[in-house]
Swiss-Prot record:
Residues given in the record as ATP 2 binding sites: G1416, F1417, N1418, G1419, A1420, G1421, K1422, T1423
Gene transcribed to yield this protein: Abca3
InterPro entries the record matches: AAA+_ATPase, ABC2_TM, ABC_transporter-like_ATP-bd, ABC_transporter-like_CS, ABCA, P-loop_NTPase, R2_ABCA1-4-like
Summary of subunit composition and partner proteins: Homooligomer; disulfide-linked.
Pfam families membership: ABC2_membrane_3, ABC_tran, R1_ABCA1
Protein name: Phospholipid-transporting ATPase ABCA3
Domain spans labelled ABC transporter: 530-763, 1381-1614
Carbohydrate attachment residues: N14, N53, N124, N140, N228, N620, N1350
Length: 1704
């Protein structure tokens, strides 16, 4: 029942998501109906003609050759050839035949058939051969007689001559050639008579070509040879004529041709979009990790697939029902698209195809984890699986059954063949019926409709198996892969028995064994919601075991938040995955509310709430729907859902967003909803993985409040990288390292165990006395330690055990504040971050905790030597002083950076090597660049060779037995003895051949019309010939009737009659077996095939364009990637010139293009394509290809600006290349055919399309080939020259001629295009177009700026900000040169519907050795400021100066003095850390001899040496940020911009980065930094400003801002409660009384957290009061901190309006 409920829920979810994507759903419905509509429109447009009466044809005489043989051939006389020439019998018979006809001809004997074939092929007079009679007997002697069982074949001209004189005059048009001896019926049957207007039956021309006349003459000559006198007498009494079967009333319907050819394509196109949608939808859930989350909530994988399958099946059912209706409904006069087919069978066929399409889409989806890439590749694969049908269709009649079935393993080919069969059955007149399921269309065919349906279902099953297997073995990023042979393992099917280590009773206390000094005592009065006992997890990575967690034992209590901390890889996520049942544990137990995780997961999940690190939200479900969906998934009953959802919305404060889709929610609201999903349905156990990641300070606070409210009756496990979050939320904090639990206890307990004490920070006045301060501090607190002395701040560490001395210290400092030159001072207690770092170091070094002296907030150069030694030990820095600082000092003295030409050459080399590294590392792409063109061309040349090789028609025996068992009606209206005798002999002869003779007593033709009407299309296969014997006076007339629906029935009918006569004359042993074996092609026909080589050139060009479409697109990938990750911008900021950047790329890409081009020449040589390999034309082809490369590569660069994702760029540019090349090429080529009469338009379009390199390449290759073959033929002989003149076939002596078919204009165009596209590229890159636009908009923008500034200037300006502005507005030249960065009234307005003032007149000077922090909420203008300062955005007004150079006018010089670390890592995944630093060192102009030393120093300073030679893509987030910072620092730029440099780093990595930045600052660099981390700003910044709505609202040192804007203190205290129940209450009452207005922030487990307000409270007073209260109230421990910088920051929150999505 639960399964059914889950399935229904998933179907509801899928249906809702589909319903919300209105455009997609409409398109999915519309496209199939559109294509069905096209067929209906064609059905209505194409007029069918009703023929109400039977069509009866006249008799055809076969006594004489057709009239055109009366005219002599070009050679002079007709020749009648025979083989073998040495046989007297053969000669006699041939001479007899010659005398039979009244035309002038001579007999020509050949000793062997090979000689005859050579004569036909190579003798230019061979067109005079009328026919050849070849006897299939070995005459050993000339006198050998002809046996009674005669076998011979007739060989007529390959090209049917009666058509020769009716040609269109265009030799390039393909004539209907050959005798169709490979098939008995046409590929597509017709519902009416084949060639209804031809009494002689038309193609292949047995009567009009004289074949029957010759056949009858030879047969008569054989009879005369064996019975001369009797034969003579018989022929006098008898006449043989032929006649075409009459045809019953019919409807002539040309529409059926459209059905036969277009139905497969239209069906494929109908389902394409839906297939792509399926792929995208399924992969999107995987990409967004929704599938993994639903699995954690207890959803089975098979249910997930089943729900998708059912949903799409039901959708397809609706679509195909409509399609069937449109196909089968009568649109006019009882005519439909499929008039005769059974609608239920059509529906069954379409459903089978739908099922296979769904399965195919599922299969494709398993190979990808990115939805856009999956859809792009899926689209390509979907089309690609249809292309084999293009090869199958023309060869259908030649293919064996197994080949057809094999090709049907591609569902699109199976569908196409099924649609083709439907078309054939419709043309046959019966339509497809259930009774025809196992019957082929005709005797030629060996394939039936039932096999199509079977193959479609088999395909679905196979694709399903592949889906199941691939998902298990390659589950993607978020699953556990099975071994490749998992399906052979019994454990997969039967479950895996688990080894239980150290099984204990559930009730026992798991932590007793582990209790030591770092584990705080367990709370006695609380219930453990989660008990973890000796839990371990080992992962198998290759052949090695990797320990995930080891022997974890921990209790988590109800009503508490337990915070789990640890570095990346410490085991936090593994622990959560085990507790949620995503992986099974290797050993140990965990109990959640008494249920064991290995056995009772279904029960556990009912009360489990999960909030993964990422938002588990469906873009198109509303807030309420999410809560409803997940509540139901957890098992909440349908009746309770509405109330639960309503309550949860209230708790989350999201009532007003109830019906808003999740994609429109802000980041903070999304996290709230994710937490709501975890809370819903009464989840008693919550697991929250970094619930506030990616949120700003305001949103984070809101989540903290929510969790504090909701924890009362729940067990909460939370992980975080924010230590302040752990400090504030964690009732108990557990720290994991290397998979093992290191400590556990309250925040206060851990700080007491691991903390260093208090950090006291003093802000100095200009006349400050640091020595005096230091003496005073050490006098009161002897073991105090100087922490840092940098900028305007001085900081000390005061040990915690000295708190009783703090009152006197602070009192003395307050008293002597002015005397010592102290502007302000404050203190903060040890943070959780320090605890965390210390635990990590303890694990890493196995040192005693007391021996670890942790560098505190300020990571500065003045740290003690022991600190350096420790870091060296930890990080492998052998000589820490020789870091960035040392390098800088050294360089300032010795190093002169390259400039001018040397710098440009160095930068060119750096950029060139970057491209080379990309090709080297992305070898798969390089392989594709080479293999795709080679494969395309090779396949094309193979296909051309295979298809254009016009094989000589094979021999076909003209016998009824070829058609299987047939009915032969005959009538004997004649009463003569001869007629009776002939009819009896006919019966005997047919029965002997196992045919079915049927005597018709009435009129034979009426009988044939009646049977054809009754039997429909089946009649044409069962009845092929008929005979009648009439008397006409003394003469008996034997009529051989033939059913013209079969190609060879005329000759077969005559063969039966002639055999009948022969047997009458010579007895039953006599027989004549005749075959049709067309002649081989002669010179003229081969010449025509040379002209078809023109078509071959077209095919080569077409395939080359397909190959180049894929190859050319690859040149956009790196361009888009570099721009998307901002690496290109950072390279420009690092000093590289636009021309250097693009020309180096172009040079490498042209070299890359040259490789496949040369290999293409090898392929042409291998296939011996003369046009490109003879007469030095290889050089011409290489020139064409390289000019194409020169033109297309800059075009790809230019078009890369339209895309922000490399995969999208690649797929869409490939489509662009295909359309701009193939579509235009085909269009122009078709219009050039004279018969189309659009030659003038084709010339115009050809000139228009010259701007497209793809079109130029296609036309150039095609024209070159055509010109070569035409010229070669037309100059080969006088006869060829005569034909060329006669048919006006043109060629050019010079291949580079401007006129067609020369390639001059295409070559010129490609050469010019490259230059034009590069010019456009530089115009865009140098912002010339933007500058023009800026100039035009300048006046309007100034007015807008003034108006916007008036609007925003409401609040009075802060005094510090005003003073900074006034200093900058009156600058001196010296101060400008000495100050690394001056920002002067900088403003930015974005032109949009409502103009946005992003930055408003900010002014600032950053001095040497200063680190300036830029703080602000999202949308405050920080990033816009950075973009203007680095030249990425234009400046609206104001200016900025770097080293005295203006950003507006000297951006090139400015960039040489600037380092930049963008917010998101602008790194190139294909390079190593060392390679990137070397590249940027070159860009900065560091001399080559010094680069290695410089890079080594940077790596050492960044602690990146162990990772230096690893690819950047393998780096952790922290290492990437370090490398980004290193790039900003290398080359010693005067000003360094760091945009959120420590985002996503764990605390250890963050500290190391701070250290690097601090050392750079101390070396004299000016640093500007933005950050969301207030702690980071306190650690690094000497001054900072808070930005609101584009303006500075305050400015000064961190301590100055805290003293100016902050008020009050933060107090945490732990009270002993042993033996005294109300001790805590007494202490709370004391605080309320002593500190009026104090706010109780949090209370848990004998701990309280207060905010103490008031500016009048001094540090001395606070410590004095608390020291006295310590004994009186049993206070175990307490800590006091000044209000944090974060609280100052939050005090400005109300001034910032809600941000727009662009977050400027």
């Amino acid at each position: 029942m639960a399964v059914l409920r889950q399935l229904t829920l998933l179907l509801w979810k899928n249906y809702t998501l589909k319903k919300r994507k209105v455009l997609v759903t409409v398109l999915e419905l519309f496209l199939p109906l559109l294509f069905s509509g096209i067929l209906i429109w064609l059905r209505l447009k194409i007029q069918s003609e009703n023929v109400p009466n039977a069509t009866v044809y006249p008799d055809q005489s076969i006594q004489e050759l057709p009239l055109f043989f009366s005219f002599p051939p070009p050679g002079g006389t007709w020749e009648l050839a025979y083989v073998p020439s040495h046989s007297d019998a053969a000669r006699t018979i041939t001479e007899t035949v010659k005398r039979e006809f009244m035309i002038k001809m001579r007999v020509h004997g050949f000793s062997s058939e090979k000689d005859f074939e050579d004569y036909i092929r190579y003798d230019n007079h061979s067109s005079s051969v009328l026919a050849a009679v070849v006897f299939e007997h070995s005459f050993n002697h000339s006198q050998d007689p002809l046996p009674l069982a005669v076998k011979y074949h007739l060989r007529f001209s390959y090209t049917r001559r009666n058509y020769m004189w009716t040609q269109t005059g265009n030799i390039f048009l393909k004539e209907t050639e050959g005798w169709h001896t490979t098939s008995l019926f046409p590929l597509f049957p017709s519902p009416g008579p084949r060639e209804p207007s031809s009494p002689d039956g038309g193609e292949p021309g047995y009567i009009r070509e004289g074949f029957l006349a010759m056949q009858h003459a030879v047969d008569k000559a054989i009879m005369r040879y064996h019975a001369n006198t009797s034969a003579q007498q018989l022929f006098q009494k008898l006449m043989v004529i032929t006649k075409r079967f009459p045809f019953p009333p019919y409807i002539s319907d040309p529409f059926l041709i459209a059905i036969q050819y277009q139905l497969p394509l239209l069906l494929m196109l109908s389902f394409t979009y839906t297939s792509l949608t399926i792929i995208r939808a399924v992969v999107q859930e995987k990409e967004k990790k929704l599938k993994e989350y639903m699995r954690m909530m207890g959803l089975n994988s098979w249910l997930h697939w089943s729900a998708w399958f059912l949903m799409f099946f039901l959708f397809f059912l609706i679509v195909v029902s409509f399609m069937t209706l449109l196909f089968c409904v009568k649109v006019k006069k009882d005519i439909a698209v499929l008039s005769n087919s059974d609608p239920s069978l059509v529906l069954a066929f379409l459903l089978c195809f739908a099922i296979s399409s769904i399965s195919f889409s599922f299969m494709v989806s398993t190979f990808f984890s990115k939805a856009n890439i999956a859809a792009a590749v899926g689209g390509f694969l979907y089309f690609f699986t249809y292309t084999p049908y293009f090869f199958v269709a023309p060869r259908y009649n030649w293919m064996t059954l197994s080949q057809k079935l094999l090709s049907c393993l591609l569902s699109n080919v199976a569908m196409a063949m099924g649609a083709q069969l439907i078309g054939k059955f419709e043309a046959k007149g019966t339509g497809i019926q259930w009774r025809d399921l196992l019957n082929p269309v005709n005797v030629d065919d060996n394939f039936c409709f039932g096999q199509v349906l079977g193959m479609l279902l088999l395909d679905s099953a196979l694709y399903g198996l592949v889906t199941w297997y691939v998902e298990a073995v390659f589950p993607g990023q978020f699953g556990v892969p099975q071994p490749w042979h998992f399906f052979l393992m019994p454990s997969y099917w039967c479950g895996n028995p688990r080894t239980v280590v150290g099984k204990e009773e559930e009730g026992s206390d798991p932590e007793k064994a582990l209790r030591n000094e770092y584990f705080e005592a367990e709370p006695e009065d609380l219930v453990a919601g989660i008990k973890i006992k000796h839990l371990s997890k080992v992962f198998q990575v290759g052949n090695k075991d990797k320990m995930g967690i080891r022997d974890l034992t921990l209790n988590l209590y109800e009503g508490q938040i337990t915070v789990l901390l640890g570095h990346n890889g410490a085991g936090k996520t593994t622990t959560m995955s085990l507790l949620t049942g995503l992986f099974p544990p290797t050993s140990g137990h965990a109990y959640i509310h008494g249920y064991e995780i290995s056995q009772d997961m279904a029960q556990i999940r009912k009360s489990l709430g999960l909030c993964p690190q990422h938002d588990v939200l469906f873009d198109n479900l509303t807030v309420a729907e999410h809560l409803y969906f997940y509540a139901q998934l957890k098992g909440l009953s349908l009746q309770k859902c509405p109330e639960e959802v309503k309550q949860m919305l209230h708790i989350l404060s999201l009532e007003d967003k109830r019906d808003l889709r999740s994609k429109f929610l802000s980041g903070g609201m999304k996290r709230k909803l994710s937490i709501g999903i975890a809370l819903i349905a009464g989840s008693k156990v919550l697991m929250l993985d970094e619930p506030t990641s990616g949120m700003d300070a305001v949103s984070r606070r809101a989540i903290w409040d929510l969790l504090q409210q909701q924890k009362s009756d729940r067990t909460v496990l939370l992980t975080t990288h924010f230590m302040d979050e752990a400090d504030l939320l964690g009732d108990r904090i557990a720290i994991l390292a290397k998979g093992e639990l290191q400590c556990c206890g309250s925040s206060l307990f851990l700080k007491q165990k691991y903390g260093a004490g208090y950090h006291m920070t003093l802000v100095k006045e200009p006349h400050c006395n640091p020595e005096g301060i230091s003496q005073l501090v050490h006098h009161h607190v002897p073991n105090a330690m100087l922490e840092s002395h940098a900028g305007a701040e001085l900081s000390f560490i005061l040990p915690k055990e000295s708190t009783h001395r703090f009152e006197s210290l602070f009192a003395k400092l307050e008293k002597k504040q002015k005397e010592l030159g102290i502007a302000s001072f404050g203190a903060s207690v040890t943070t959780m971050e320090e605890v965390f770092l210390r635990v990590g170091k303890l694990v890493d070094t196995s040192m005693d905790i007391q021996a670890i002296q942790l560098p505190a907030l300020q990571y500065q150069h003045e740290r003690r030597a022991s600190d350096w030694a420790l870091d060296s030990n930890l990080c492998g820095v052998m000589d820490p002083t020789n870091g960035i600082g040392a390098l800088i000092e050294e360089e300032e003295v010795l190093v002169k950076l390259n400039t001018g030409l040397a710098l440009h050459c160095q930068q060119f080399w750096a950029m060139f090597l970057k491209k080379a590294a990309y090709s080297w590392r992305e070898w798969k792409m390089v392989a594709a660049q080479v293999l795709v063109p080679l494969t395309c061309l090779t396949l094309a040349l193979l296909a051309i060779h295979y298809t254009s090789e016009i094989f000589d028609d094979p021999l076909l025996k003209l016998s009824l037995n070829e058609y299987g068992r047939t009915v032969v009606p005959f009538s004997v209206p004649g009463t003569s003895r001869l007629a009776q005798q002939l009819s009896e002999n006919l019966r005997d002869m047919l029965q002997a051949e196992r045919q079915e003779p049927r005597e018709v007593l009435g009129d034979l033709e009426e009988f044939l019309v009646f049977r054809a009407s009754v039997e429909g299309g089946g009649f044409n296969e069962r009845c092929l010939v008929a005979t009648s014997f009439k008397d006409r006076g003394e003469l008996t007339v034997v009529t051989a009737l033939f059913n013209n629906q079969a190609y060879h029935s005329p000759a077969t009918a005559l063969a039966i009659v002639d055999n009948l006569l022969f047997k009458l004359l010579c007895g039953p042993q006599a027989s004549i077996e005749i075959s049709n074996y067309p002649q081989p092609r002669n010179t003229l026909q081969v010449a025509k095939d040379h002209f078809n080589e023109g078509r071959k050139g077209f095919d080569i060009a077409l395939n080359l364009l397909i190959a180049m479409a894929f190859l050319a697109s690859t040149f956009s990938i790196l361009a888009v990637s570099e721009r998307a990750v901002q690496a290109k911008h950072v390279q420009f900021v690092s000093g590289v010139h636009v021309a250097t950047f693009w020309f180096s790329a172009l040079l490498w890409d042209l070299i890359s293009f040259l490789v496949p081009s040369l290999l293409l020449l090898v392929v042409f040589q291998a296939f011996n394509v003369h046009a490109f390999t003879r007469d030095g034309h290889m050089a011409d082809l290489l020139l064409l290809l390289m000019l194409y490369g020169w033109a297309i590569i800059p075009l790809m660069y230019l078009m890369s600006f339209f895309f922000s994702a490399a995969s999208t760029a690649y797929t869409r540019l490939t489509i662009f290349n295909i359309l701009s090349g193939i579509a235009t090429f085909i269009m122009v080529t078709i219009m050039r055919i004279p018969a189309v009469k659009l030659e003038e338009l084709s010339r115009t379009l050809d000139h228009v399309f010259l701007v497209l390199p793809n079109h130029c390449l296609g036309m150039a290759v095609s024209n070159f080939y055509e010109n070569y073959e035409t010229r070669r033929y037309c100059t080969s002989s006088e006869l060829a020259a005569h034909y060329c003149k006669k048919y006006n076939i043109q060629y050019q002596e010079s291949f580079y001629a401007w006129s067609t078919p020369g390639v001059g204009k295409f070559v010129t165009s490609m050469a010019a295009s490259g230059g034009i596209y590069l010019t456009l590229l530089f115009l865009i890159e140098t912002n010339l177009l933007w500058r023009l636009r800026t100039f035009i908009c300048a006046f309007r923008r100034r007015w807008t700026l003034a108006e916007l500034q008036n609007r925003t200037s409401v609040l009075p300006e802060d005094q510090d900000v005003a003073e900074e502005r006034s200093r900058i507005l009156v600058p001196s030249l010296d101060s400008m040169l000495d100050t690394p960065l001056i920002i002067n009234e900088l403003s930015k307005v974005y032109d949009q519907r409502a103009p946005l003032l992003a930055v408003d007149r900010i002014s600032l000077a950053v001095q040497k050795g200063e680190c300036f922090g830029l703080l602000g909420f999202n949308g405050a203008g920080k990033t816009t400021t950075f973009k203007m300062l680095t030249g990425e955005e234009t400046i609206t007004s104001g200016d900025a100066f770097v080293g005295g150079y203006s950003i507006s006018s000297d951006i090139g010089k400015v960039r040489q003095r600037m380092g930049y670390c963008p917010q998101f890592d602008a790194l190139l995944d294909h390079m190593t850390g060392r390679e990137m630093l070397v590249m940027y060192a070159r860009l900065r102009g560091i001399p080559e001899r010094l680069i290695n030393a410089c890079v080594e120093n940077t790596l050492r300073g960044l602690l990146l040496e162990p990772h230096a030679n690893k690819l950047v893509k393998t780096y952790s987030g922290g290492n990437k940020r370090k490398l980004s910072t290193g790039i900003a620092l290398i080359g010693e730029p005067a000003v360094i911009f760091l945009d959120e440099p420590s985002t996503g780093m764990d605390p250890v990595a963050r500290r190391l980065l701070w250290d690097t930045v601090a050392r750079a600052r101390e070396s004299g660099k000016a640093i500007v930094i933005t950050s969301h981390s207030m702690e980071e700003c306190e650690a690094l910044c000497t001054r900072l400003a808070i930005m609101v709505q584009g303006q500075f609202k305050c400015l000064g040192s961190p301590q100055h801002l805290k003293s100016k804007f902050g008020s009050g203190y933060s107090l945490q205290a732990k009270v002993r409660s042993e033996g005294k129940q109300d001790a805590l209450e007494e202490f709370k009452a004391f605080v309320d009384l002593t500190f009026p207005g104090s706010i109780l922030e949090d209370e848990h487990q004998d701990m309280v957290h207060y905010h103490l307000p008031g500016c009048d409270l001094s540090w001395a007073k606070v410590f004095g009061i608390l020291e006295k209260a310590k004994e009186k109230y049993g206070v175990d421990d307490y800590s006091v901190s000044q209000i944090s910088l974060e609280q100052v920051f939050l005090s400005f929150a109300h001034l910032q309006p809600p941000t727009t999505e662009d977050g400027r």
